[in-house]
Amino acid sequence: SVYEHTANALRHLKKNGCAPDLTQVGNEITFGMLWPTAKTDPFNEKNWDVLADLLKSGVRACREVCPNARLIIHTEHAGDWDATKNYYMRLRNHNVDYDIIGLSYYPMWHKDIPNLSRTLDSLAVDFPKKDIMIVETAFYYSHDNDKWAKSKDEHSDLYAISEDGQAQFTKELVDMLKKHPKVTGLYWWFPEENESGKKVIGSWINRGLFNNHTGKVVKAMKNFADYRSNND
């Protein structure tokens, strides 16, 4: 069950001295989880009672095993305000307990930074008791036509696909997030990707904070660290 799986995983972490400060039930679950059983849609009530029950089971395990950890519910449509709002409204209507709204934000899929800023403004108004975190973000510093990246042209109109372009994106994102007091965390997706990354996922994604070709830290690392220096 979701409860047993979650509780066992957390007990294992605690036993080994790694009790988390944050927990998250599900990953990018705008459209539910454990398909088809709990497949959902933010615009349709179908299966939401099932999803809510599964989330409540996971939440109960988190609260019991790690009572001091704050709990995130993580979705991946930050570029679509209606979908984001509907999702968290349905959580509210089904009385799902959590602390933090977690969002994935990738500019190549979720529109530009001003659009994300508007979503954050609206979340702060409609869900004032919830903190917000960007729990996944990244952008390219290189493009090797890998299986995840689609085409280079698809993303090059946002920022240059280069270390400078990645650094510009990171700086603009951090500068914007600092203006939103409800945002309390920023996490880079797969920052540790390096020259051995192909062994992990089968290809290079080239969105980490180490250059796959040189093994050196990319320029965006400094911009990313600027967020933490203002939010300790």
Stretches with model-predicted labels:
Residues 1-7, 45-56, 81, 110-117, ...:
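Non-membrane alpha-helical structural segments and their capping/turn regions in soluble enzymes
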Residues 15, 39-45, 118, 122-129, ...:
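Aromatic-rich peripheral "rim/lid" segments of glycoside hydrolase catalytic domains that contact
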Residues 4-8, 40-100, 118-130:
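Active-site neighborhood of glycoside hydrolase catalytic domains
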Residues 29-33, 79, 107-109, 141, ...:
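Feature marks short, surface-exposed loop/turn motifs that line or immediately flank catalytic pockets
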Residues 6-45, 72-74, 183-190:
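Active-site groove signature of glycoside hydrolases
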Residues 1-25, 50-61, 87-94, 167-180:
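An active-site-proximal structural segment forming one wall of the substrate-binding cleft
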Residues 19-21, 27, 73-75, 84-114, ...:
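Aromatic- and acid-rich polysaccharide-binding/catalytic face
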